[in-house]
């Protein structure tokens, strides 16, 4: 597959991942994520700090979508956008970002990419935390809201302040993950209805996205023998 991939031009629009970092030298990512677009606000390495490669997986999904179609084909895969990455979570031995500073960290990560390259981009924020008061604004969600409408902001203690008026020229599209469901139930519909989005997905000016699948057939791998899908499509 890697031999059939044609990366987008250097100045093409990008998906900027604010996540756990990306393993940039991955064979399917390296030509779409330049070293100059591989950042971190913690330490010096932009490589994935997650033990299971969360940021790398999210970057691959944003770049290719479902890989099955490409793997089963022999056609050239022409890409039309590039990747950027800012690592926002610590690796081994690095200091955790205080929860009160998640918003400030997001502002810093956003500025880092915009200073580095003036290209068009969509921000993909796939980090979240359990909310203390589900649905209510937080310092983090307020920072995302301000970034989305092109407003400068600052945290003063536990207060959030806007320091400029909205600027349409500086507006940004933020796609924010709805969060995770950490437990499983047979009645998945009730579980979906009763689960709340995680912070900062309650922000008003971002596009909050959750996950779904159309994979409704049992895998062919023998280890899944006897397994059945939980539900039908729709």
Indicate residue ranges for each PLM-predicted region.
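Generic recognition of flexible, low-complexity loop/linker segments
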Residues: 2-5, 47, 72, 160-164, ...
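Subtilisin-like serine protease catalytic core
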Residues: 3-37, 45-101, 118-122, 134-135, ...
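Substrate-binding/access-modulating region of protease and related hydrolase catalytic domains
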Residues: 88-203, 215-216
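Short glycine-rich loop/turn motifs that provide flexible caps or phosphate-binding loops at active sites
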Residues: 54, 178, 233
């Amino acid at each position: 597959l890697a031999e059939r991939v044609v990366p987008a031009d250097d100045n093409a629009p990008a998906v900027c991942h604010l996540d756990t970092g990306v393993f940039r030298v991955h064979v399917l990512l390296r030509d779409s994520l330049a070293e100059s677009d591989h950042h971190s606000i913690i330490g010096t390495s932009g490589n994935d700090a997650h033990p299971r490669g969360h940021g790398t997986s999210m970057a691959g999904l944003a770049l290719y979508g479902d890989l099955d179609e490409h793997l089963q084909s022999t056609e050239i895969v022409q890409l039309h956008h590039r990747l950027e990455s800012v690592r926002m979570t610590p690796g081994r031995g690095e200091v955790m970002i205080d929860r009160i500073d998640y918003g400030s960290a997001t502002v810093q990560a956003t500025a880092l990419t915009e200073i580095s390259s003036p290209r068009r981009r969509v921000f993909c924020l796939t980090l979240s935390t359990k909310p203390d008061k589900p649905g209510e604004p937080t310092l983090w969600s307020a920072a995302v809201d301000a970034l989305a409408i092109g407003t400068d902001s600052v945290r003063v203690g536990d207060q959030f302040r806007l320091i400029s008026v909205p600027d349409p020229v500086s507006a940004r599209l933020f796609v924010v993950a709805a969060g995770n469901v950490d437990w499983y139930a047979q009645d998945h519909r009730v579980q979906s209805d009763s689960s709340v989005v995680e912070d900062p997905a309650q922000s008003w000016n971002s596009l909050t996205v959750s996950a779904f699948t159309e994979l409704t057939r049992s895998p062919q791998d023998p280890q899944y023998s006897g397994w059945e899908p939980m539900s039908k499509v729709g």
